[in-house]
Amino acid sequence: MKILMEKISLLALSLMLVSTYAISPALPEMIIYYGRQGISSDWVELLVSLPSFAIIGVLLLTPWLSRVFSERLIIVSGLCLLSFGGFFPLVNQTYSLVFVSRLILGLGIGLINARAISIISQFFTGRERIKMLGLRGSAEVLGSAFLTFIAGQLLTISWSATLLIYGLGLAILALYLLFVPQVPKKVQVQEQPLKKQAKPEPLTSRRLLYILSLALYAGFVILINSANTLRIPVVVTQFGLGTAQQASFILSLMMLMGILSGTFFSSLVEIFGRSLMSLVVLVLGAGLLVMWLAHSLLVLGIGALLTGFVYSLGVTYVFNLISETIHKRHLHTATTLVLLGCNLGGACASLVLRLFGFFTSGPAEAFAIFGGLSIGLGLVLWLKRRFS
């Protein structure tokens, strides 16, 4: 029972890693609310992706923070900042104050971001590690889907009520303090002799380039998923396909598909191997094209479910690939670099959508552009894999 609760508590750290986009169902009402104050929709959309910029800043400071502070203190501080930054706009909805609170939310998520993933590799090895990484990806998606669904229900009260979802951070904090030990004993026993016997080998430029390519891949997948999360509620309401609550339901189902992919993750890795990377973006592109051509809520939902399935699969595969190919001495650095790519993709979502707006006539055309880029990348990866 103790081991089970330890696993649950470790997985719970991932429940709110992408919670910054959970309030997306409230975007249409937020645009109306701040529009009355003369604030454009672009600036309102920025509030949703804004925490990602703070996350990037924290990740850049991660090596220094890890040397100065203990892992436990960093995680506890992160969960406290996450909860406070998420809750604050309930008290005051002034744009500038909400802007600051979203940055605080990002600081909190950034502090636990890399550790929620690397801690799995510290506590587990072999097939159990692969299984836990798959479950971690599912936990991340489950948290996002659950929070997005709850936000949609709270939207019937007011858009600011959706921020109540960040109270989950306090529950996760309690689980972590109660059930997660400070340092696995087996890691202590292994690391001490290594430090005496040999100095850590530097990260080669070739290996660094490999890590950066994985970071770009993961960032691209997350850019598309984040853009979908921002754009689906707008498309549903503007085109009269449904209500904001129905858009919230689609987003929740889209994210829940990630749980299904996480469940089959280890089996899919065994079947497709390295070809899984190209397959993910090819299917992602197909789903985006379905969303672009959709003239009903049902068809839009089918495309969203397709993208939701492969999104989590692609990101989880990148982290698994890193844990398999990168030495443990450099694992935290590699994880941090990939997370930088992931959060850069998420942070740029609203900016990229704004860029697309300069040469497109409608919000749904972003799906077509992303779809074409995804299929192009998938073909390049497939050809590279086939002829290398």
Regions from the PLM with identified roles:
Residues S323-T360:
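A late C-terminal transmembrane helix in Major Facilitator Superfamily
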